[in-house]
Amino acid sequence: MSIMKRESLPEEYIPYIRHVNQHVIALNSRCLMTVMAVEGVNFDTADINHLNSLHNQLNTLLRNIADERVALYSHIIRRRETIYPESRFFSSFAATLDEKYKKKMVSQELYRNDLFVSLLWNPTSGKTEQLASFFQRLTKAKKTQSEPDMEAIRKIEELSQDLIQGLESYEARLLSVYAHEGILFSEQSEFLHQLVGGRRERIPLTFGTIASTIYSDRVIFGKEMIEIRHESNERFVGMFGWKEYPSKTRPGMTDGLLTAPFEFILTQSFVFKSKAAARVIMGRKQNQMINAADRASSQIDALDEALDDLESNRFVLGEHHLSLAVFADQPKTLVEYLSKARAHLTNGGAVIAREDLGLEAAWWAQLPGNFSYRARSGAITSRNFAALSPFHSFPIGKLEGNVWGAAVALLKTQAGSPYYFNFHYGDLGNTFVCGPSGSGKTVIVNFLLAQLQKHNPTMVFFDKDQGAEIFVRAGGGKYKPLKNGQPTGIAPLKGMEYTEKNKIFLRSWVLKLVTTEGQTVTEQERQDIAKAINSLESLPHAQRSLGALQLFFDNTSKEGIAIRLQRWIKGNDLGWVFDNDQDDLNLDSQFIGYDMTDFLDNEEIRRPLMMYLFNRILDLIDGRRIIIVIDEFWKALEDDSFKAFAQDRLKTIRKQNGMMLFATQSPKDALNSTIAHTIIEQCPTQIFFPNQKANYKDYVEDFKLTEREFELIQSELSRESRRFLIKQGQNSVVAELNLRGMNDEIAILSGTTKNIELVNQIINDYGADPDTWLPIFHQRRENQ
């Protein structure tokens, strides 16, 4: 295929003049335009009924904004994504993990789909002027710098807001002017620049026309191929158009393109027709069939029914066109991509044509407002357009501008697109993680926590079975495995300042030690404990022990506080729990881990222990960034102190810049709790792993997953795939974490009993600095 050297000046084909305001652009035809970016809906995890409902809603929206002075363009721009979230870590392990993972991810072919819808309004067309004749003059109109009519600006802004509201389910927003490093840039110009040159870059506001600003690459047209020359590279483009429309349309006819392994621009336009013009078009088509003695009487009957639907306002009619521009770095590669693209486009029954003689017109017809360049257009209904442009896509998350800054982690979706994961959904970061043993839950949770270290939060991890011990220690944290019969290093009477608030807590805590569940406490006992705490304050810090506290009580009563406190004093059967030489909870560390597995079933110890721990953790929730992680939290929920802590903090921790992460093997564990409603409501980010034994009621009726999401979890996703479902609000996506070849890192993220013992041996010999013991650990582990 030869390239013919044929170029044109931008003003001849690009109709955009300038910004009227931050949202509205004026065209040289005096048309006005706004552009919206649309997140879209993930068709891959949505129920069919939901997609059909959205299709009906789109049709209703199109009917509501129908006006012969209005036109819509929709674009899908599929492009390679190479951006990796910015990262700086306070632990060398997290930095090494990120470096290896980044290298793996940026080498992959990840593509994203950017969806846009453009709204055009003709302010000069009177009620008696036919829109068709006006659009024929659009590209012939002379360039004008005259001020647009203020009423027209008001009208397009109103229509834009109506469109934004109607697309609420798709998360649409108006493109606008923005500032970056003190310079004003235009999102609309950046979008249009992609249509003109197929490349994304920042476009500043200038005193010149938008047309001259966005034409920065040379676009050269050949017989069947376009060459786009940039100073650093060149690209080649081939185009398809719809020659004949399919007999029926359905939502998702072009969804196959959304996973294609190449870049493209899919353009569609829809110019609304008046009801009178629609009657003429449909009547003419019906007469053609009758005059031709067409035997397909069913088609004539269908047109009768369609005319009735038109009169009943069940749809509106518009002039539509569709084109697909496919990009490649080499002509040979382009041929391969075009073959794949053709298969996707013909999947719905349409007849498509490769653009050759009309290639240049087809290219410029991608630009909203270039109506006269649409060589292949046809009349379709709003229901057809809603099916052909259903705003299906895959969520990509949010790279920047999150509550804590850049995205926590870049993940790959099942569709091969990037997903920028954040714990936060809006300003709420609480997260619920559910997956059976062996599903990969531990690796992924700890990986995300390692990535979170870029935001420098305080991290408190309540572990079970020491599964995260190696990870906490490798991340520069301090880990305290609390074991039955072994001194805990906890001494509440020595660990707290004797403020009025803390003394009130210590009174309640001592009561916990000397009473059993349901036991009545007398007012005299409360007063005695308060006096004893006040007296203990006068002692030197080192002498504030439970043994010393006992001396302030009457020891003559066989059932008094002194006797009931006896077993908690050093040297007695529970003296190892709280009567220690010093209180060392490691609260000065930025990363703290506790393992309480031994005590979860021991209510007598668990109640006062968790009461104290969570009270001290409360002091850390002071506005600093903090995440509190509780593994197998359902077991902890059996404790009243934790239950109260969780119920209160789930609702309020966001106000103090914190979040909580709850992990469990089964959703039923959470649902059995009396605060299940709070957990579901206050954890907008939910991560579910494959589970062949998943219960429909637990997942769908209680956790409100869609039937499609449940189907994915129960049957379609395998454990071996290392894929999982992320749900935030009403949106969900299937993502994967590929750590193949990163065996050293996996050994840290998911600790085995054997490796935990090895790490503790090495730390005993070489110290707790992970930069020292990690290399030794990897060497010995490989030699085992």
Curated annotation (Swiss-Prot):
Keywords: ATP-binding, Cell inner membrane, Cell membrane, Membrane, Nucleotide-binding, Transport, Virulence. It comes from Bartonella quintana (strain Toulouse) (Rochalimaea quintana). ATP binds at residues 435-442. InterPro entries: AAA+_ATPase (IPR003593), CagE_TrbE_VirB (IPR004346), CagE_TrbE_VirB_cntrl_dom (IPR018145), P-loop_NTPase (IPR027417), P-loop_TraG (IPR043964), T4SS_component (IPR051162). The keyword Cell membrane applies. This is Type IV secretion system protein virB4. The keyword DNA-binding does not apply. Component of the type IV secretion system VirB/VirD4 which could be a major virulence determinant for subversion of human endothelial cell (HEC) function. Altogether with virB11, may be implicated in providing the energy, via hydrolysis of ATP, for the assembly of secretion system and substrate transport.
